[in-house]
Amino acid sequence: MLERLNHVAIAVTDLKSAANTYRDILGAKVGEPLDQPEHGVTVVFIELPNTKVELITPLGENSPIFNFFNKNKNGGIHHICYEVKNLELSMNILMKNNYKIIGDNPKIGAHGKPVIFLHPSGFDGTLIELQEE
């Protein structure tokens, strides 16, 4: 089912400062901020040779990231995203094995591809995002 690691998402309190650190101090290729209103976040992608880092910050108080900051005042790792070849097949396998999918249907993610999130309770406390290749 799992293919490659697509990205690791880090919730940050100051998106501009975090992006500057990755670009100016760590020398990484940093993308432009991208609002994702359907997910309630603004994201910046850091391009690395073998994967990406996604810096995320809430768009408002209704954002799931806003709730994350209630528990993690300074931010931190929010989720890990893996690619799958067939998201619908992956969802069926997961549901048949009683894993919880957050939300009813896939949404279009920041890369323009369908994504789902898997509840952390089935993955040792880690929020997992699956993105169709």
Where are these regions (language model features)?
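A short secondary-structure junction signal
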Residues: N20-T21, T57, E129
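A short, sequence-level motif marking secondary-structure junctions
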Residues: P58-E61, E133
